[in-house]
Regions:
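Cofactor- and metal-binding active-site motifs of prokaryotic enzymes
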Residues: 2, 62-174, 186-187, 337-339
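Alpha/propeptide regions of enzymes that mature by internal proteolysis
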Residues: 42-86, 246-264
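N-terminal glycine-rich anion-binding loop in soluble enzyme alpha/beta folds
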Residues: 2-63, 189-238
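Conserved, well-structured core segments that form the ligand-binding/active-site neighborhood
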Residues: 46, 128-321
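Extended hydrophobic packing segments that form well-structured cores
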Residues: 367-464
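Short Gly/Thr/Asp-enriched flexible loops that form oxyanion-binding sites at enzyme active sites
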Residues: 92-105, 279-291, 420-421
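C-terminal catalytic subdomain
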Residues: 297-409
Length: 464
């Protein structure tokens, strides 16, 4: 008989809106350690997960052997759980780490809890048990995250959310499909994607889509839907500069066509060859459409940057919010000036209607509508990151700084980032020699460590 009994805890809060998480508790067939402490830790751990807004599945019956593990996994799969958290309140059977690795291909989050405070006997060896499991999973080449701490500790809860987001990101990538309309922009060969390397490394599939067929789709969007969308654009309150409201219709068509295509093809992300065909054939750049879609939480990239769209998808899945996909325009040793011609997510710009708010304008080069001109917000923590392919492998990097007021103003979207520790001259040179493409992503948070941990989880080579 198990020495871990059913765990009574309060019902989850707002269960209808919660994300289902598999929470398995490793029990013991033989009595041992401090089972009162074990039970208390289980109750507090599950309650902490529920307080964080997760709907926990599987915690009510302990995992004792292969048979109970199979039953537990059937339940969590039926509930659609993307992430699996393994609790080991007292040290259990290490052999089950390999059984779980065989049955659950996605990353596993191991949570080790503290010993009972005070003198006397060892109460649980929870950290020792999870150390054992982690070592075995690594030697089996199975990705995992390890969290250690008390259920009531704020830092522990933050680590749990991060670890579960990382695990679900890897799981989502394995089942994701990214669409690419056309190819990379002319000459931008550094953005070329390898569909089979993507499948082998990240698990996702690349779906090639016809640019001429997309143009036909843009032209055939229902007029009533276009009129409704133009009203939605007006409500954004964006100023007009060298454009008129007559220019809004074509970009609404692009916006609706991209949304329609993503829905029809079940795409988790989309990138588009935005020039030269679109400005020449439909008369506009689709950049307002991209700025709106990214602000709404869709992973959409320009110039055929497949890896850029994938990185956007990763960031959103990790809970990092939207990213600005941009050129690295210039730098000195402590600052980098990022610029692109007008498709930054609207929520990363200053508020519409304000002094520095964005406006709708014409592209600086092929002088046609419709781009979003506007600085991005300064005074914010910032991370600059990139995922890329080189030498038949994937690589990733990220580093942190802070956005500061720009030294000069350009059309398009710009932001000046200061890196306190400097070293950007050497960093840029090293990154180019590592094959990093000319686009990077910028997030409004310090999240370099989240990128490092995701790279480790995915088996992607990390560049510090």
């Amino acid at each position: 008989m198990s020495s871990v009994t059913e765990v009574p805890v309060a019902a989850p809060k707002s269960a209808g809106t919660q994300r289902n998480i598999a929470v398995l508790i490793l029990g013991r067939k033989r009595p041992g350690f401090d089972q009162e402490w074990n039970k208390l830790v289980c109750q507090r751990s599950v309650a902490a997960m529920q307080d964080l807004g997760f709907h926990c599945v599987g915690y009510d019956l302990p995992v004792l052997d292969d048979a109970t593990l199979r039953v537990a996994l059937e339940r969590v799969r039926a509930a659609g759980c993307e992430s699996l958290l393994m609790l080991q309140p007292s040290m259990g059977n290490g052999q089950l780490a390999l059984s779980l690795s065989q049955a659950w291909p996605d990353p596993i989050v191991l949570w080790a809890t503290p010993e009972r405070p005070g003198d006397g006997k060892v109460s649980s060896c929870s950290l020792v048990g999870q150390h054992l499991w982690g070592s075995m999973l690594r030697q089996a080449n199975h990705p995992f995250e390890l969290v250690y701490g008390d259920p009531g500790d704020a830092a522990t809860r933050t680590s749990l959310v991060q670890a579960l987001n990382l695990a679900s990101t890897a799981a989502r990538l394995r089942n994701a499909k990214i669409g690419v309309i056309g190819s990379y922009a002319p000459g931008f060969i550094d953005l070329a994607a390898d569909p089979f390397l993507l499948r082998r490394t990240l698990g996702l599939q690349l779906h090639a889509l016809s640019l001429p067929q997309f143009i036909d789709r843009v032209k055939s969007i229902d007029e009533a839907a276009v009129r409704r969308d133009i009203e939605a654009v007006r409500e954004l309150g964006l100023r007009l500069k060298d454009v008129t409201e007559d220019d809004l219709g074509v970009n609404s068509r692009c916006y609706l066509a991209m949304r329609q295509l993503m829905q029809e093809e079940s795409l988790a992300g989309l990138c588009i060859q935005c020039w030269p065909e679109l400005p020449e054939v439909i008369g506009q750049w689709p950049y307002l459409a991209i700025a709106r879609l990214t602000a709404e939480g869709h992973a959409v990239a320009m110039e055929g940057d497949v890896d850029g769209a994938i990185a956007e998808l990763m960031g959103r899945s990790m809970g990092l919010g939207n990213a600005f996909l941009t050129d690295w325009l210039e730098h000195d040793d402590k600052t980098v000036f990022l610029w692109h011609p007008g498709m930054a997510p609207l929520d990363m710009c200053y508020a519409a209607g304000g002094q520095n708010g964005p406006c709708l304008a014409r592209h600086f080069n092929i002088v046609k509508p419709l781009v979003v001109d506007g600085e991005l917000r300064s005074g914010q923590p910032v991370t600059i990151a990139r995922l890329w392919r080189c030498d038949n492998e994937y690589r990733m990097t990220a580093f942190e700084g802070r956005s500061i007021p720009p030294r000069r103003r350009l059309t398009g979207n710009t932001i000046l980032v200061e890196v306190e520790r400097g070293g950007l001259m050497r960093r840029f040179d090293d990154l180019v020699h590592e094959g990093m493409p000319h686009h990077v992503l910028m997030y409004y948070s310090h999240c370099a460590d989240a990128h490092r941990r995701l790279a480790r989880m995915l088996g992607v080579r990390w560049f510090e």
